[in-house]
Swiss-Prot record:
This is Sterile alpha motif domain-containing protein 1. SUPFAM superfamilies: SAM/Pointed domain. Disulfide bonds: none annotated. Gene3D superfamilies: Transcription Factor, Ets-1 (1.10.150.50). The gene is Samd1. One of its GO terms (cellular component) is chromosome. Unmethylated CpG islands (CGIs)-binding protein which localizes to H3K4me3-decorated CGIs, where it acts as a transcriptional repressor. Tethers L3MBTL3 to chromatin and interacts with the KDM1A histone demethylase complex to modulate H3K4me2 and H3K4me3 levels at CGIs. Plays a role in atherogenesis by binding with LDL on cell surface and promoting LDL oxidation which leads to the formation of foam cell.
Amino acid sequence: MAGPPALPPPETAAAATTAAAASSSAASPHYQEWILDTIDSLRSRKARPDLERICRMVRRRHGPEPERTRAELEKLIQQRAVLRVSYKGSISYRNAARVQPPRRGATPPAPPRVPRGGPAAPPPTPAPPPAPVAAPTRAPRAAAATAPPSPGPAQPGPRAQRAAPLAAPPPAPAAPPAAAPPAGPRRAPPPAVAAREPPAPPQQQQPPPPQPQPPPEGGAARAGGPARPVSLREVVRYLGGSGGASGRLTRGRVQGLLEEEAARGRLERTRLGALALPRGDRPGRAPPAASARAARSKRGGEERVFEKEEEDEDEDEEEEEEDNVSEGSEVPESDRPAGAQHHQINGERGPQSAKERVKEWSPCGPYQGQDEGRGPAPGSCTRQVFPMTAVNKEGGSACVGAAPDSPSPVPLPPGKPALPGADGTPFGCPPGRKEKPTDPVEWTVMDVVEYFTEAGFPEQATAFQEQEIDGKSLLLMQRTDVLTGLSIRLGPALKIYEHHIKVLQQGHFEDDDPDGLLG
């Protein structure tokens, strides 16, 4: 007859009880890995890792029931390997190792509990005491770094190990701030570096102040910088006038004043009929190539930087003519530096009364009519923007003998017809050549074709001929008509439209407000 079963020794029973308790309170390594991988996977897909999703995904991947997964998850939460987060009324779980570490000044995280063995728990004492005074402050963090991690939730350990090396080096060079938390010595150097760096930029910014120059003298434009628009009052003030105290300044008055100065010899006429300062009074020059590039780079009412001092050089003759004609026609006289006196003023070489000058509109050249540089009438200024630019693009001037078949007078906006001379031709133009009507309303289809050919659009001009567009039709064309009504590609059509509208706008604006285009 068998006796009662033998009881295990008391020591063995105690050890078994301790092991059972430890195994019940610690999560299984497999479950810990599965749960943490599931949380990371859900978060990488921007899915909220709540309890239901975690249990379902662990079951699908590895097979355990949701109850077991829930129990293992609770153990991981107790071990601080997983964090429970409540956000907007819903509870989700995060991998503690992937959560942002706490701020450096905050209290260090508690080291993970190690349930398996009592002897492995007391690592804070073996931490070697460093020589600096700041050792007590970092003792808990160093202890956390040296503590052996548990099988699963060892994540706080690496954070402490990352923080400890960052905080350890600073106390060696500076002993006084070592008593502060580790963040103190670490954050101190950047402000010091920042304090050393700011003085450098002010030294770099010191050179610009001596650069400003008086705008009326046109020094900035001569030096190659952007030209500042000049008002009529500045022009009159430079010439020694009253600055328009007697009434409103108009371009006609300023033009008359400039012509009087030219008659006195204070201003001189260039080869192309423009007014300029005597050569001895002009500021420094820019090279001819630079002036040509500057004149070409800006079009349509912008301030120009161009030079006329090199007009006597034969090799640059054609280039100078193009630049001067285009500048004289496109840019209002008030948009150029007054000191340089590069206002393309109407007139001829020699004294002439202001009333006679008002009547003259012809853009003829200096070789035959001495009037190439003549721009618009005093009250209208830049009325020949579009046509003169068109002539320039063809590489010649309106009445220069180099191109005998080029149509000379350039069309003007409606309502501003040129006053003919005694022989029926515009002033200054040589007779003997059939002239295109100066009023676009009177243009024929061939005049329109010729007009766009001179403007640099010979291929597109045929489209206007095919559609039989005369002057009246051209003036009535809208934007959509130019862009879609003709067999012209969009790019050239846009250029043609902008070219065309530029002239109309300037004509209307100057009729309403003579000073409307001043800078």
